[in-house]
């Protein structure tokens, strides 16, 4: 068996084409989806991520607004800007690019964003709705992962999903999303004592730990679907995931590569959430 490679970039492009069609129909009704991105400081990685989001908006026809502040901005001023955007009918989604400077409390910033414009899915109300299976904006990377698994046409219901990693951004929420799809979910983390025994039970294995090539063939059940969320840069400058891709290729049935696997889906699901927010708001732009 040689695993089928799930090409996240191709899935993302297909979904963006669908979003573009939806945006055209919304604009015919006078509704223009809008995303505001707040960037604090000059971090090159953050700036690169923001550029990707701007490019995605342009690709599907979403209005985007980049608001930049110096690293010295006060928390009070940043909160005031979020208040302004919460009240701006042209803006359907608000995203604050993390990380923020140490003198600003990220929790306070995230909680100030209106849940109706929380297209990142990080607000406690959004998280609570996700936990209870209510309709809400889902966190972008976990949502993208579920969509990639669905591309395999595997029936998730009743399957055993093992998640390696328990971060608030990926590990915890992705397990909850699979639970909402009626999967049986097991979490593994740095304190798990019998990790290989557990991962070898997985029909679907999600790896999100940030350790290059940690997961090898002996972690994986024959025919499992393997989703590699990790992005690590080796000393050679080459990117690799948390899964030893070549080593696992002959054991898994499906696998995502790094790069061009999970990554392209994250921004695509952000665009999806922004379009959904515009539909819900239904505000005609004048």
UniProtKB/Swiss-Prot annotation:
UniProt record, GO biological process: L-histidine biosynthetic process; methionine biosynthetic process; purine nucleotide biosynthetic process; tetrahydrofolate interconversion
Molecular function terms from GO: methenyltetrahydrofolate cyclohydrolase activity; methylenetetrahydrofolate dehydrogenase (NADP+) activity
One GO location term (cellular component): cytosol
Entry's EC annotation: 1.5.1.5, 3.5.4.9
Pathway in which the depicted protein is active: One-carbon metabolism; tetrahydrofolate interconversion
Classification via InterPro entries: Aminoacid_DH-like_N_sf (IPR046346), NAD(P)-bd_dom_sf (IPR036291), THF_DH/CycHdrlase (IPR000672), THF_DH/CycHdrlase_cat_dom (IPR020630), THF_DH/CycHdrlase_CS (IPR020867), THF_DH/CycHdrlase_NAD-bd_dom (IPR020631)
Keyword set includes Cytoplasm: no
Superkingdom of origin organism: Bacteria
Gene3D superfamilies named in the record: Leucine Dehydrogenase, chain A, domain 1, NAD(P)-binding Rossmann-like Domain
Chain residues that bind NADP(+): 165-167, 190, 231
Pfam families with a match to the protein in the record: THF_DHG_CYH (PF00763), THF_DHG_CYH_C (PF02882)
SUPFAM superfamilies given in the database record: Aminoacid dehydrogenase-like, N-terminal domain, NAD(P)-binding Rossmann-fold domains
Reactions catalysed according to its record: (6R)-5,10-methylene-5,6,7,8-tetrahydrofolate + NADP(+) = (6R)-5,10-methenyltetrahydrofolate + NADPH; (6R)-5,10-methenyltetrahydrofolate + H2O = (6R)-10-formyltetrahydrofolate + H(+)
UniProt KW keywords: Amino-acid biosynthesis, Histidine biosynthesis, Hydrolase, Methionine biosynthesis, Multifunctional enzyme, NADP, One-carbon metabolism, Oxidoreductase, Purine biosynthesis
Keyword Oxidoreductase: yes
Assembly and binders: Homodimer.
Function: Catalyzes the oxidation of 5,10-methylenetetrahydrofolate to 5,10-methenyltetrahydrofolate and then the hydrolysis of 5,10-methenyltetrahydrofolate to 10-formyltetrahydrofolate.
Family: Belongs to the tetrahydrofolate dehydrogenase/cyclohydrolase family.
Protein name in the entry: Bifunctional protein FolD
Source organism per UniProt: Bacillus anthracis
Origin organism lineage: Bacteria, Bacillati, Bacillota, Bacilli, Bacillales
Gene coding for it: folD
